[in-house]
From Swiss-Prot:
Allows the formation of correctly charged Gln-tRNA(Gln) through the transamidation of misacylated Glu-tRNA(Gln) in organisms which lack glutaminyl-tRNA synthetase. The reaction takes place in the presence of glutamine and ATP through an activated gamma-phospho-Glu-tRNA(Gln). Heterotrimer of A, B and C subunits. Keywords: ATP-binding, Ligase, Nucleotide-binding, Protein biosynthesis. GO terms for molecular function: ATP binding; glutaminyl-tRNA synthase (glutamine-hydrolyzing) activity. GO terms for biological process: translation. One of its GO terms (cellular component) is glutamyl-tRNA(Gln) amidotransferase complex. This is Glutamyl-tRNA(Gln) amidotransferase subunit A. Coiled coil: none annotated. It catalyses: L-glutamyl-tRNA(Gln) + L-glutamine + ATP + H2O = L-glutaminyl-tRNA(Gln) + L-glutamate + ADP + phosphate + H(+). It is an enzyme of class 6 (ligase). Belongs to the amidase family. GatA subfamily.
Amino acid sequence: MTELNKLTVADSIKGLKNKDFTSTELIGAHIKQIEKHRNLNAYVTDTFDLALKQAEAADQNYAQNNARTLEGIPFAAKDLFCTKGIRTTACSNILKNFIPNYESSVTQNIFDKGGVMLGKTNMDEFAMGSANITSCFGNVISPWKANDDNADLVPGGSSGGSAAAVSGFMASAALGSDTGGSVRQPASFTGLVGFKPTYGRCSRYGMISFASSLDQAGIFTRSVLDSSIMLEAMMGFDEKDSTSIKAEVPELQSAIGSSMKNMKIGVPLSLGEGSIIEPDIMKMWQDTIELLKNAGAEIVDITLPHAKYGVAVYYVIAPAEASSNLSRYDGVRYGLRVERENMTLDEMYEMTRSTGFGEEVKRRIMIGTYVLSSSGMDAYYLKAQKVRRLVANDFNNAFAKVDAILLPTAPTAAFKIGEKQNDPTIMYLNDLFTIPASLAGLPCASVPAGLSARGLPLGIQIIGKQLDEYNVLKVASTIESGVKHIKFEPKVF
């Protein structure tokens, strides 16, 4: 029998319904795995007591035939989802001891469906990063190793703790947030399915903000079916979020295994990527195109002429919004306060923020403050907003001809911890392929599609039309079936 912590969400639900095991046993297996792999630093706060209580309640519901859709299923939450009475820090010193008195809508939705929370996962500070190396709790180590090297690898970011938890069988699923690729890129690096829904599909209420016009809750799972199950539970209109979309939550599970006949898949002729793409990524992309052709899809050449400006646009708009959102952390209302005798209010602000924020967060606040200044507004911010509109228009034009778009998720496989740290611009290019869809607010997923020559997982990205999560899952499921001969599992696990 498969170890309980290695079961997918779908198989766990089936086993619990058949009474093959209890939720208490399932949760116990995951707790044991978490304790065994503390060195990966995936979790920053455990909620084992809560999880065991929730599991006990789930077992009672199964006994009484009152089980909900996620009854007894273990999940983890990125540490920017506020959890009532449970520490929520965004992995920043400025919020290191913050305990919210309210629950985020997304975690509440999962609790309402019977989900069991194992804990809060590590992340880049305030979700700013691509390698999970800016957390005040230390970096996360990927469960994966290259087959020619034993060096520790990054899990991707900013949702690296969630990716490591699911990839390392320390959770069946895990919540992340995706602003410019923070679910999709870690999913690619760790051999997982990572899904970012349409902007507004999942409520942002109770999510600690980075860039409000881009932030969206996402999910990590080990199968496309699991992704559809979790998305159905997470999504839905929320009057507490002004950007929430008033649309029915679709039935998504029927997308799994659907025919690709008459599906048109767009492949961009160029994104101006040059030599940044590793050869392994190019081969995986071409192999996936052939896979979809053989499955009955029609491949259509498309152009996204403004996508090449995506990274530049993102690193104007996102820091601008961050500088505004993070201005609330001033040492007065909540979070860290640094003070000394005879200190003025301005000095207290300065000391608190300079002590509480890490270097990358301070860098982005400064960039954002500048582009919103009188000298930067016209030169940078307003121009970036105009180009953002052009990027969205490019997608609209493409989707007049195709049902989905296929791109690599990241230009490289996972890299060693410590690499690319000295030059922020090199790190920013990790999001080269994920940012354009974020700027347009589109649903997209990364699904494992191959292994590099060094044995590391490579993800392919599927981008769909607004509110068309169904077709994204349909294409992802076809790719998953086509590469089922590849085992996307870290060797030591």
